[in-house]
């Protein structure tokens, strides 16, 4: 399960997803470390395996990324 992060303890970075999406509107976001992503109020755990953290987003989805501060942010956004 995902850790229960508190937004008051970490830097919150707002990323506006406004990219070219494929015809199936599949946007894969995965992370090399232990992070959490807030999508429209829903916290999603990001695993090293891209398929484990795959989500379907709209092009106007606002993504909030919580950085634990332990390591430098290392996020990958793959479009398929």
Curated annotation (Swiss-Prot):
It is found in: Secreted. Optimum pH is 7.8. Active from pH 4.0 to pH 9.0. Keywords: Fibrinogenolytic toxin, Fibrinolytic toxin, Hemostasis impairing toxin, Hydrolase, Protease, Secreted, Serine protease, Toxin. Inhibited by the serine protease inhibitors DFP, PMSF and TLCK. Not inhibited by the serine protease inhibitors aprotinin, elastinal, SBTI and benzamidine, the cysteine protease inhibitors iodoacetate and E64, or the metalloprotease inhibitors EDTA and EGTA. It is an enzyme of class 3 (hydrolase). GO terms for cellular component: extracellular region. GO terms for biological process: proteolysis. It comes from the Eukaryota. Its EC number is 3.4.21.-. Its main location: secreted. Body cavity. Optimum temperature is 45 degrees Celsius. Active from 30 to 55 degrees Celsius. GO terms for molecular function: serine-type peptidase activity; toxin activity. Belongs to the peptidase S8 family. Monomer. This is N-V protease. It comes from Alitta virens.
């Amino acid at each position: 399960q995902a850790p229960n992060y508190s937004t008051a303890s970490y830097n919150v970075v707002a990323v506006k997803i406004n990219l070219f999406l494929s015809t199936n509107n599949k946007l894969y976001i995965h992370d090399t470390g232990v992070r959490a992503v807030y999508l429209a109020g829903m916290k999603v755990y990001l695993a090293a395996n891209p398929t484990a953290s795959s989500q379907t987003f709209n092009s106007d989805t606002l993504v909030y990324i919580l950085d634990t501060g332990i390591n430098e942010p290392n996020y990958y956004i793959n479009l398929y």
